[in-house]
C-alpha cells in the first residue's frame, strides 16, 4: 500500500477515535453543565485546563522524538523509556509542591487537592506512552483508536456516575485518572510485541538528538499552552469561578472540538511528513493540502454555529447559560482562525525545526498576555473573548513570517488560498443561515434541526459541484479507499 493510501486509511481510524472522544466529551460537558451548579462547573473547567497541561507534559515530547527519527535502535528506545519514567516522578513532585501556590493565586483553596490528585498521571502515563508512539510511527491507528476509544468511554462513565451522585467537580478528576490508567495498562500489554524496555546504563550523548528535539518540543508546548489557556486563570482571578465556567463552556464548544478534529489529520500526517522530510517540494504540496482539508471541515461547523449560537445554547445547556451567547459567537470566529495555523506544528516536527516555534511562542506570550488581561478587565467575559479573537488574528498573520517562510520558502499565495478558498465555499451556507435566523426567530428543536439540515445540505451541495482540483482529488481518494475497504 502506498504512503498516500496508508495515510488516508490511518486517518479514517484516527477520525473514528477522535470523533468518539469528541462526542463523549461533548455529552459529558452537556450532562455536567446541567447537573452541576455554575460554581462547581467553573471549578471543573479549571481542572480541565489542568488535564490538558498534564497530557502535554506527561512524556515531555519523547514520543514525538521517537516518531521523528527514521531509524531508532532498541537501546535508544530503552534509554528514552527510563528518562520518561524519571521525568514523570520529578513532575509529580513539582506539581504537588506548586499546587498550593496555584490554588492561592486563583483564590480557590479546594483546587490544591484536585491538582495533587491529577498529578498521579505523571506516574502512570509514561509506562504506556512509548508503545503509543511506536504504533503511531507505524501508522497502526486501527489498534490505537480502539484502545483510546474504550479507555475514554470508561472514564466518561465514571465521571457521569460520580457527578450524578456527588454533584461535585471532583468527578472529572476520577474519570480522567481512570481513562489514563486504562489506556496505559492496555498499551503496555499490546505494545510488548514491539519491544520490552531493559535497564541498561546508557550514555546520554547516545540519545542527545532525541532529547534536544524533545526539549524544544516540550518548551514549545508549554509556551503554546500558556498562549491558548492563559485566559482561564485570568478570568478566574478577575471574575471568579462562575464566569470561568461560562467562558470555558463556550471555549469547549467553539475551540476545543475543532482543535481535536485537526489532530485527526495532523497526528497521522506527522509520521507521514517525517518520511518525506528531505523532499521540500513534496512536503510543501502535502502540507498545504492539509491546511485546505482542515479549513473545509472547520469553517462550516464554526461559522454555522456562530449564527445559530442562541438556539444551540438554549436547547443544549439550558436557559441559565444564555449569558454566554456573545462569548460563544466570538470564540467561533476565533476558533476558525486558530485552526488555520494549528497544523504548522506537524510540519516543524517533521523537519525537526521546533526552535522556530519556541521563538515564535515567546513573542506571542509577550503580546497575548497583556491583550487578554486588559480586555478581560475592560469588558469581562465578552472582553476575554474579544482579546482571544485579536490574539488568533495576530497568530494567523505572524505564523507565516515566523514559521512557514523559513521552512518552505516564499509561499504566501498558497497560505492565503488555504483558508480563503474554503471560506468562499462556506459563504452560500452562511448567507442562507443568516436569512433563516432573521425569519425564524422562534427557538425550538424542530427549527434548530431544520437550520442545521438546510445549512449542511447547502454546504455539501457546494462542495459536490465545486470544480476545485483539490476537492476533486480528495473525493477520488476517499472513493478509492471506500472501495478497498
From Swiss-Prot:
Pfam families: Polysacc_synt_3 (PF13440)
GO biological process: polysaccharide biosynthetic process
Residue ranges the record marks as coiled coil: none
Membrane topology field: Multi-pass membrane protein
Subcellular localization, as worded in the UniProt entry: Cell membrane
GO CC terms in record: plasma membrane
Chain ranges passing through the membrane: 13-33, 38-58, 79-99, 111-131, 160-180, 211-231, 234-254, 297-317, 321-341, 365-385, 388-408, 420-440, 445-465
Family assignment from sequence similarity: Belongs to the polysaccharide synthase family.
UniProt name for this protein: Uncharacterized membrane protein in cps region
UniProt lineage: Bacteria, Pseudomonadati, Pseudomonadota, Gammaproteobacteria, Enterobacterales
